[in-house]
From Swiss-Prot:
Disulfide bonds: none annotated. Belongs to the intron maturase 2 family. MatK subfamily. Usually encoded in the trnK tRNA gene intron. Probably assists in splicing its own and other chloroplast group II introns. GO terms for cellular component: chloroplast. It comes from Marathrum schiedeanum. This is Maturase K. Keywords: Chloroplast, mRNA processing, Plastid, RNA-binding, tRNA processing. The gene is matK. One of its GO terms (molecular function) is RNA binding. It is found in: Plastid, Chloroplast. GO terms for biological process: mRNA processing; RNA splicing; tRNA processing. Its main location: plastid.
Length: 508
């Protein structure tokens, strides 16, 4: 007789089929994975005699040196006496971090692939901007009346992250290896983590950091979403009993059974609260439709969860609850505010005419021009008031290198901000970037920018500011009970090929 699996542990056991590939962590194939994925095209230092191309033979030599060294006996004196040893250590850390990021992403890639096996692709539609992947900003937010935003105040402790990862890693050797790697090699350059000044990583090598940070966020958000579903039923005292990760899903099942058996009539009277939660770059937002008293209760649950379980301190007086129609806030790189659009409709019935005035709420999504100009000024594209500037050293570059530098930046900005409701601020950014590109090009033939621009024509670099498109894949999930097409649910999967955070969009 086949043993029946307990469904209460389904969420905890689902990852065991595609468990982490621990042997890969201790094999040389980790460097092959990093090389094949091209995560670091140029990380070798020029002053050590290496060229800019990736040499697999160099990596093999570094692997041999890595096996011969004792990493537990590292000291600051050794690093100062031997700068080449410091470079090797940084190179080891980069390769280990990039290889680990690939390995830990393998189970999630397999789960994503299996989730689409039973889905039938209906169509692929193109959308004009990144803004289309946030339809709730237009569909949901205009009907809400309260918004609360705040920041994660203090960094995450490394041991707290190891404590969360111990539920995933069943191999003690791998867990000890990660703990050693965190404390010896890693420099948390992100404000969410504690910083160490021993080793400095490249800013672009954030793939492992993104995975670890999301694993931390997943833990508290899983509890947070459960509280949202049981918001009206969850009292204050039993709140602390839902924090243990191993028994969390079991308690959810038991609590659901108690509510369904004990008070079925009461459950029908309660309506699911219209609460929306957004997390973006260390910021969190709550949007709600209802009374401020209930929003204060939700704020209390959120602060208690972080302070008592995740050891993250919040200043409750800095978490404000504001009316949405009076408050604008920054989210996903945009400046969001609620705008009232008045409309007048004239209706005539027989000899009587009626004028109906109606006001509709619409989400106004703007480019944060002040923050954008500040970011461009730090990158030396303009001054503090937005006038384009140029460095004399840029004239030493080839024309193709100058244009290529601006092409990549303009494509990213146009791709990200083409979904703004007003294009005026975006056109101002286009103006700054275009003339910042023209100034170093005009200095080579020693002509003015106006004469150089007139020679090239007004269409110069216009193709760089075209609105890019993203794809939306629409699937149909087959219904096991009926083959009727009307009973089959559609699933929309948004595809976006921006996998790195742009410095100009990542506002500090």
């Amino acid at each position: 007789m086949e043993e029946k699996k307990d469904p209460r542990y389904l969420d905890l056991v689902i990852s065991r089929k595609n468990d982490l590939l621990y042997p890969l962590i201790f094999q040389e194939y980790i460097y092959t994975l990093v090389h094949d994925h091209n995560l670091f095209p140029t990380i070798l230092l020029e002053n050590l005699g290496y060229d800019k191309r990736f040499r697999f033979l160099i990596v093999k030599r570094l692997i041999t040196q890595m096996y011969q060294q004792n990493h537990l006996s590292l000291s600051a004196a050794n690093l100062k006496q031997n700068p080449y040893f410091l470079y090797n250590k940084v190179l080891y850390s980069q390769k280990i971090s990039e290889g680990l990021s690939i390995i830990v992403e393998i189970p999630f890639s397999l789960q994503l692939e299996t989730s689409f096996k039973n889905l039938e692709l209906v169509r692929v539609q193109n959308l004009k901007s990144i803004h289309s992947i946030f339809p709730f900003l237009e569909d949901k937010f205009p009907y809400l009346n309260l918004v609360s935003d705040g920041l994660f105040s203090y960094p995450i402790h490394l041991e707290k992250l190891v404590q969360i990862l111990r539920y995933w890693l069943k191999d003690p050797a791998s867990l000890h290896f990660l703990r050693l790697f965190f404390h010896e090699y890693w420099n948390w350059s992100h404000p969410s983590f504690e910083k160490k000044n021993l080793i400095s990583f490249e800013k672009r090598n954030l793939r492992l950091f993104v995975f670890l940070y999301n694993s931390y966020v997943y833990e508290y958000e899983s509890i947070l979403f459960f509280i949202r579903r049981q918001f009206f039923h969850l009292p204050s005292k039993p709140f602390r009993f839902f924090f243990e990760r191993l028994y969390f899903y079991v308690k959810i099942e038991n609590l659901t059974e108690v509510f369904s058996k004990g008070s079925p009539v009461t459950l029908e009277l309660f309506k699911e609260p219209n609460i929306h939660y957004i997390r973006y770059q260390g910021k969190f937002f709550f949007a709600y439709k209802g009374m401020p008293l209930l929003m204060n209760k939700w704020k209390y649950y959120f602060v208690t969860l972080f302070q008592n379980h995740f050891d993250v301190w919040f200043q409750t007086d800095k978490i404000h609850i504001n009316p949405l129609y009076k408050h604008s806030f920054h989210c996903v790189g945009y400046l969001l505010s609620l705008k009232w659009n008045p409309s007048v409709i004239r209706s005539q019935m027989l000899q009587n005419a009626f004028i109906i005035e109606n006001t509709m709420k619409k989400m106004d999504i703007l480019v944060p021009i002040i923050l954008m100009i500040d970011s461009l000024s730090k990158m030396k594209f303009c001054n503090k008031i937005g006038h384009p500037v140029s460095k004399p050293t840029w004239t030493d570059l080839l024309d193709s290198d100058i244009i290529d530098r601006f092409v990549r930046l303009c494509n990213k900005i146009s791709y990200f901000y083409s979904g703004s409701s007003k294009k005026k601020n975006l056109y101002q950014i286009h103006y700054i970037l275009r003339f910042a590109c023209l100034k170093p090009l005009a200095r080579k033939p020693k002509s003015s920018v106006r004469a150089f621009f007139k020679k090239l024509g007004s269409s110069f670099l216009e193709e760089l500011f075209l609105e890019x498109q993203i794809s939306s894949l629409i699937f149909i999930r087959s219904s096991p009970r009926s083959s009727d097409r009307s009973n089959q649910s559609k699933v929309r999967f948004w595809y976006l090929d921006i996998i790195s955070i742009n410095e100009i969009i990542n506002h500090e």
